[in-house]
């Protein structure tokens, strides 16, 4: 009986763009958020935005590979924000697109990626990292030290239906 291989961690490059796009689409599909058409439109817009962020270094990514296949990935956006009394720094980390393919779930790969992304944030001097957790991943992030905040959101377009995942969860 052979042991389960341990996926190899490496930094993302622009060559991983389609992996990150596919993982984002799959993530929202898994959460049953949006329609197939809406996810297609999102993918096109995201592809353009992420390419720009990866090229400029505003976004850093990590990929876990096994046998040459990307099985999990994460992105860390360096987000301009306002200084606060908590920290005078005007850049925060925004962790997003944490995704593991279904065949590799329950192996703590999301935790490994998140830990590695937080290490990267520390190396970059980031003092605060934010994220939006799916219901399924909320417990993982709370165990890692993330806390719910007072963030609120207003949908300004009549054409946008508020997803059930945005409902208050505290």
Where are these regions (language model features)?
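Conserved GNAT acetyl-CoA-binding A-motif
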Residues: 114, 121-133
């Amino acid at each position: 009986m052979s042991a389960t291989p341990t996926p190899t961690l490496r930094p993302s490059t622009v060559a991983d763009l389609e992996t990150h796009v596919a993982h984002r689409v799959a993530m929202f599909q898994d959460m049953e958020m949006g329609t197939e058409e809406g996810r297609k439109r999102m993918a096109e817009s995201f592809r353009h935005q992420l390419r720009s962020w990866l090229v400029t270094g505003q976004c850093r990514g990590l990929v876990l590979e096994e046998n040459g296949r990307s099985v999990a990935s994460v992105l860390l956006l360096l987000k301009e924000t306002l200084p606060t009394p908590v920290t005078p720094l005007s850049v925060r980390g925004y962790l997003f697109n944490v995704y593991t393919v279904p065949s590799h779930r329950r192996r703590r790969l999301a935790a490994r990626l998140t830990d590695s992304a937080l290490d990267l944030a520390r190396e970059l001097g980031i003092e605060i990292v934010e994220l939006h957790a799916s219901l399924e991943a909320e417990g993982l992030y709370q165990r890692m030290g993330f806390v719910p905040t007072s963030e609120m959101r207003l949908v300004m377009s009549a054409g946008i239906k508020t997803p059930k995942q945005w409902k208050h969860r505290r």
